[in-house]
UniProtKB/Swiss-Prot annotation:
Transmembrane residue ranges: 15-35, 47-67, 72-92, 107-127, 141-161
Family assignment from sequence similarity: Belongs to the peptidase A8 family.
The protein's enzyme class: hydrolase
Stored Pfam families: Peptidase_A8
Protein name: Lipoprotein signal peptidase
Keyword Endoplasmic reticulum: no
Origin species: Vibrio cholerae serotype O1 (strain ATCC 39541 / Classical Ogawa 395 / O395)
GO biological process, one term: proteolysis
UniProt pathway: Protein modification; lipoprotein biosynthesis (signal peptide cleavage)
GO molecular function: aspartic-type endopeptidase activity
């Protein structure tokens, strides 16, 4: 059976439930943060000696990339997220559902991307709340969606190394 003749049930689109779960968890956490935490550094909750909960607005991309710009980046990142989501969904449609590693990676990225797009469209910014630091250095605040995007991307990169190792050597 060729990949193009897979039924929806046989294809990787079966894994979109994971993207939906990530999206729902991300939006739920962000709503809880917005409704229950004061905005900004003064209202942080110190959890561990290297970790705070901190409600901030991110007008840029992951880890505040381009957040200091004048607003054009909101639509750029929204457009990129739509293109990437469409591309990954297309690849999931062509992959068998049994290719768990890649389908999980794609679903994590899709769920995170859609969560951040939702924020950009509804609020005009992305809600970030995780603040890790060492001494006086603080990693830019981020959220669950950013985390799942990074995990999915790391899985794709790792899969590239795995695929190279399992390929037969040519003489």
């Amino acid at each position: 059976m060729s990949n193009s003749s897979l039924t929806l049930k046989q294809s990787g689109l079966r894994w979109l439930w994971l993207a939906l779960l990530v999206f729902i968890a991300d939006i739920t956490i962000k709503l809880i943060v917005m409704d229950n935490m004061g905005y900004g550094w003064a209202n942080r909750i110190e959890v561990l000696p290297f970790f705070n909960l901190l409600y901030v607005h991110n007008y840029g991309a992951a880890f505040s990339f381009l957040s200091d710009q004048e607003g054009w980046q909101r639509w750029l990142f929204t457009g990129i997220a739509f293109v990437v989501t469409g591309m990954l969904a297309y690849w999931m449609r062509r992959l068998p559902a049994s290719d768990k590693w890649n389908n999980i990676a794609y679903a994590l990225i899709i769920g995170g991307a859609v969560g951040n797009v939702f924020d950009r469209i509804v609020h005009g910014f992305v809600v970030d709340y995780l603040d890790f630091y060492w001494g006086t250095y603080h990693w830019p605040a981020f959220n669950l969606a950013d985390s799942t995007i990074c995990i999915g991307a790391a899985m794709i990169i790792l899969d590239g190394f795995r695929a190279k190792k399992s390929a037969p050597s040519q003489s």
